[in-house]
Amino acid sequence: LLGGMALEAVLLARAAPGFVGNRLQFAVLREALHIVHSGIASAEVVDQVMRASLGRRYAMVGPLEAADMTGLPTVADIAHHLFPELATGDEMMALVEQRLQRGDTGQRSGRGFYLWDDARRERIQRRRAHQLRFALKP
């Protein structure tokens, strides 16, 4: 069943809070919030970069495969310079907390980082349906 949906079961070496997928997703989310909170880029730009580059790349190869393909010396050099600049705390959660205090809970309330009007919902629904059809093609 999983294979027919382009999903794969995995065997973990040990249990960890949050599962591997959620941990990776929230590492990306933490940095995305940090980028917006720090004024480096808007939410729109962060999402555009993810959709147009990283999202496509990670649909084909995982982060460690990508590191091998890039070359570990290059990865080590970039990491040496970039890691000190990445988010480590939780100060960027202020962006989420401010929205929650206003009652902006995301798609359900109609506002979060974006205004969730019918046009946005329909656009994303079409995009997701297209991607799902493509992923399920034999």
Pin down the residues of each PLM region:
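Hydrophobic alpha-helical packing residues
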Residues: 1-2, 32, 82
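Rossmann-fold dinucleotide-binding core
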Residues: 1-23
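NAD(P)-dependent Rossmann-like dehydrogenase/reductase catalytic/cofactor-binding core
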Residues: 6-14, 38, 43-138
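Short secondary-structure transition/capping segments
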Residues: 22-24, 119-120
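Structural/interface elements that position substrates and couple domains in central-metabolism enzymes
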Residues: 25-31
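Regular secondary-structure segments
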Residues: 33-37
